[in-house]
Structure formats: structure tokens, C-alpha cells
């Protein structure tokens, strides 16, 4: 399911939402969000359940929680403005999608700050069956 969703985003050439998040991750963490975080642990990628497996997976858990609090903008499709300055991201505008930008900004910084915990060998394409326990509250 994750792979199908990722391919759809790429084929459609989406300019907002998730595509902007991908670009933001590239600028801040110097990694591809699609190739590095779209199917990682219990929370990075489509859906999420259970206990985050490491600090990187926790970045995705917090990002999911942040998206859950957004009102007035579809986080996966809404377009926002931002600039990259000196390795940091500054979200612009006052529209409803600025909240999404701030969620994405925090996650990109979290990925960068936790690159040392990223464990592709263990958590890439981690089986959902290992993420069945109840999720902690946001």
C-alpha cells in the first residue's frame, strides 16, 4: 500500500503537501523522505500504530500527531510557502496550511537531529504485525 501511494504522488507530480515535505526533508536532513522515511518503523509512512521503535520513528509519530491537530488544510495536498535559509526552514504566510508547514518543518529538523538513530537495516519496511500494541496518546 505504501509503495502504491508513493508512486501515485510521484506520477501525479504533486506540488503541494507531501511533495513539499519531501523537498523540505532533502534541504534539512539531506535525505530523500520517500527513499528513507516512507516505510520506516511503525509510524513513518502510511498510517501508524504501536510504539515508535527509535527516535527517528518517534519523529514520524509526533508528525502524525501534529497533522491530526491541523484544521482548515489537507496536510497531504494543501500547499504552503516556506524558505530555506542557512539550513533552517522558515514557514511563510498566515493561511491554514502554515500549520502543516510547521509540522513538516519540525519533522525535517527531527530527522536531521536523529540521523544517528536511523537504522535502515532493522526498521526499513518494518512489518506492521510488529506494531500491534495500543498507541500512546499524542
From Swiss-Prot:
The name this protein goes by in its record: Acidic phospholipase A2 PePLA2
Any single GO CC term annotated in Swiss-Prot or TrEMBL for this entry: extracellular region
Species per Swiss-Prot/TrEMBL record: Protobothrops elegans
Reaction it catalyzes: a 1,2-diacyl-sn-glycero-3-phosphocholine + H2O = a 1-acyl-sn-glycero-3-phosphocholine + a fatty acid + H(+)
Annotated Pfam families: Phospholip_A2_1 (PF00068)
Tissue spec: Expressed by the venom gland.
Reported function: PLA2 catalyzes the calcium-dependent hydrolysis of the 2-acyl groups in 3-sn-phosphoglycerides.
Signal peptide annotation: 1-16
This protein's record includes keyword Disulfide bond: yes
EC number: 3.1.1.4
InterPro entries, per database record: PLipase_A2, PLipase_A2_Asp_AS, PLipase_A2_dom, PLipase_A2_dom_sf, PLipase_A2_His_AS
Coiled coil: none
Keywords, in A-Z order: Calcium, Disulfide bond, Hydrolase, Metal-binding, Secreted, Signal, Toxin
Lineage top rank: taxon: Eukaryota
Compartmental location: Secreted
Amino acid at each position: 500500500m505504501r509503495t502504491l501511494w508513493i508512486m501515485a504522488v510521484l506520477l501525479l507530480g504533486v506540488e503541494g503537501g507531501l511533495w513539499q515535505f519531501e523537498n523540505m526533508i532533502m534541504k534539512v536532513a539531506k535525505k530523500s523522505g520517500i527513499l528513507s522515511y516512507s516505510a520506516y518503523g511503525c509510524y513513518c509512512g502510511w498510517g501508524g500504530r504501536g510504539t515508535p521503535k527509535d527516535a527517528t520513528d518517534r519523529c514520524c509519530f509526533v508528525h502524525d500527531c501534529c497533522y491530526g491537530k491541523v484544521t482548515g488544510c489537507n496536510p497531504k495536498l494543501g500547499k504552503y510557502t516556506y524558505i530555506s535559509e542557512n539550513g533552517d526552514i522558515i514557514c511563510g504566510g498566515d493561511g491554514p496550511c502554515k500549520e502543516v508547514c510547521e509540522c513538516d518543518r519540525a519533522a525535517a529538523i527531527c530527522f536531521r537531529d536523529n540521523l544517528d538513530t536511523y537504522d535502515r537495516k532493522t526498521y526499513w519496511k518494518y512489518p506492521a504485525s510488529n506494531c500491534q500494541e495500543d498507541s500512546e496518546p499524542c
